[in-house]
Amino acid sequence: MRSNILSLRAILDKKPSAINDVLTSINAKIELNKSSNFLLKNTVEIYSKKINKSDEKILLNNIPYVLKDNIATKDIVTTGGSLFLKNYLPPFSATVFELLEMNGALLVGKANMDEFGLGGTGSYSAFGVVHHPENSSLIAGGSSSGSAYAVAKDIVPFSIATDTGDSIRRPASICNVVGFKPTYGLISRNGVFPYAPSMDHVGIFAKFVSDIAIVSDVVIKHDKTDFSSQKSPDENQFFNELAIPFTRSIRFGYLKPLEKLFNKHLQKKWNNLKKTLEQKNYQLIPLDFDVELLKVIDSIYKIISYSEAVSCYSNLTGIVFGQKVFEPNSPSNFDQTITRNRDQFLGKQLKRRFVIGAFATDEKNFEKYFEKAQKIRRVLVDNFLNLFSDVDFVLSPSASCFASTIEDIQANKPYTNIIDDFLQLANFAGSPSITIPWLVQTKDQTIGLSISANCFEDKKLLQIAYWFEQLFDLNHD
C-alpha cells in the first residue's frame, strides 16, 4: 500500500464495473455503499477529487477496502449474512469503521459471510455460498469468506473481518493471503455484531504482512466505548518497527503430537521448515500437549460459542427491528410472532446451533455442560499460555488439508481435525495469532503457516511474520 502498487485509481481504471460483477458472481458482496454514493460504476468520478487532493500524511488515504458485513456502518445496509437483517440500516457506525474513515480509507462494499459468523466454510450465508478464488467448486473458508476472497483477487488491498474461532486465519490459509487476529480487545468491538463476546476478535486480511502492520497502526486504538477494549503497548509502532531485527535468539516451538496427523504434503513442507530454521541456528523446541485436551477443543468451543450466541441474538424478534412476517388475518401472541419471524428469516444451520446453545444453558443442563465447558476452557488456556514460558512463538500448519469441496460441505462430511482446532486456543486465551502463505501445491491447494504469540506480543508477532515472509520468500502473486 505504501508503494502505491495497488492504488484506488489502478483498481478502478482496470475494472470499475468488473469489481461489482466479480463480487456478485461469487456471492462475496452483500451491499455496496449506495447510500453514500459509493456505487462502483461512479467511483472513479466520485473519488477523483479526493485522489487529486491526496494527503500523504493520512495513513490510508484513498486506499479501498471492504468490511465484513457484521460491522455496523451508519445508514448502509448491514445484514450479518442473514435474511433477518436484509434491509437493516444501523443508526450508528462501528469504531473500527470510523477510524478507517478518519484515516482516509475508502469503503467500497460489505463482504458476505456465514450467517452472524456461525460457520467455518463460507457456505452458510443467506445470500449464497462464497467459493474459492481459484476454483468455484471449493470453499473459501469462513466465516469471513467474502473478506478473504476480495483480498485474494486483488479487488482491495485489505479487508476488516472478525475471528471467533479461526474465522480470519482459516480463510487466509485457504485463499493464500495473510490473516491477523490481534490480542483480545486491541481492535474495538464497539458496533460489531457479536457471536461469542468472550472470544470475538476484530482482525485484518491483506496480501502482505507490511500492509497488515499499516492497517494495525490505524485500527489498534483503545476505545472507551468498548468495555473489553485494551490498550496496546505498541500503538502506532507496528509498521515503523516492522523490520527492526531482534536483539536475541528467538525460540520457536511446535506441538509434537500434531505431527502424527500431517498428510504427506504437510510432512514434507514441515520437515523443510524445521531444517531451514535449524540451518539458521534458531531453536526449534518440540512441545508436549495432552492429546486428550486437544481432542476436546472443538466441543468446548461449540458449547461456549453457541451458548453465548443464543444469548446475544435473543433480541432478534422482528418486532423492534429486522424482517417480520405479515399475516394480518392470523392473530398471534408475542411468542408466536417471534417464532414465526425466526422460522421464516433465520437459516437452518444457525437455528441448529442456537438449539445447541439453548440446550447447554437450560437450567437443567447449565452445570453439566456450560459450566463444565468453561472449566475445561480454563485448563486449555493455562496449558496453552504455559507454552510461552519455554518458547517465544508456536508454529503450526493453519489447516490439516487443502480446501474442501462445496459439495462435501453441503453433505456434512468432516473437514477438520485437531490440527485445525488448535487455532481456536488463541481465541480461548485472547492471544495474537497470524496465518501467512506457506504451502502452495497448486493455486487452489494452499495451507498457511500459523504463528502464535503470548498476549500483547502483537508487534513481535508481526515482526517475526515479516521475517518469515522475507526469509522463505512467502510473498505471492
Swiss-Prot record:
It catalyses: L-glutamyl-tRNA(Gln) + L-glutamine + ATP + H2O = L-glutaminyl-tRNA(Gln) + L-glutamate + ADP + phosphate + H(+). GO terms for cellular component: glutamyl-tRNA(Gln) amidotransferase complex. Keywords: ATP-binding, Ligase, Nucleotide-binding, Protein biosynthesis. Its EC number is 6.3.5.7. The active site is at 68 (charge relay system), 143 (charge relay system), 167 (acyl-ester intermediate). GO terms for biological process: translation. It comes from the Bacteria. Heterotrimer of A, B and C subunits. Belongs to the amidase family. GatA subfamily. This is Glutamyl-tRNA(Gln) amidotransferase subunit A. It comes from Mycoplasma genitalium (strain ATCC 33530 / DSM 19775 / NCTC 10195 / G37) (Mycoplasmoides genitalium).
